[in-house]
Amino acid sequence: GRPGWHIECSAMARKHLGKTIDLHAGGQDLIFPHHENEIAQSECANGCTFSRYWMHNGFLNINNEKMSKSANNFFTVREIADKYGYEPIRYFMLTAGYRMPLNYTVELIESCKSSLERLYTCRDNLDFAIEHAHGTDTALAEKCEEARKKFKTAMDDDLNTPDALAAIFELVKDINTLSDASDKATLETAAKTFDELTGVLGLLYNRK
């Protein structure tokens, strides 16, 4: 039919976002012909770059098979969330780089839930440590700075979220090891760093 799918997207982007947009995303199966058509149409019509950055995500598989109704392995995000909550799903999506295929299994989503519980426990323990601080050590502050640098390096590497998570869990290990001996100011720095890094990934939003 007319108008076609490709021109519809170019028209909507120009109307609502302008001639040049910052970021365009979609599945890898849309690179050709859809996104190439969008670029050709928009740049010819507008005389400028259509999108500054492109993100093409990998596909989601279920137990190493493509999800489809015909294979009887189809379910919705809401169905998973009803059982596990939304945050484990978010964490699960962060366990692989966005360009990589992602394989869903019950075991993996349960592992993600357990990993989140470790993060919540660490953060709650930090609050307790701050309230009852009696140490004088400041070594944890240096570990916080190292975690920030590793996290930033990971995110600058094409949003390498697996390495970003690894940086957070390295900080968790340091907090668990050093918090009892740390002074209050250092513990507060650790809490701030922890909140900043997990916040970038949209994690721990259920903390009160």
Where are the regions that the model predicts?
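Alpha-helical recognition segments enriched in aromatics with Gly/Pro capping
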Residues: 1-127
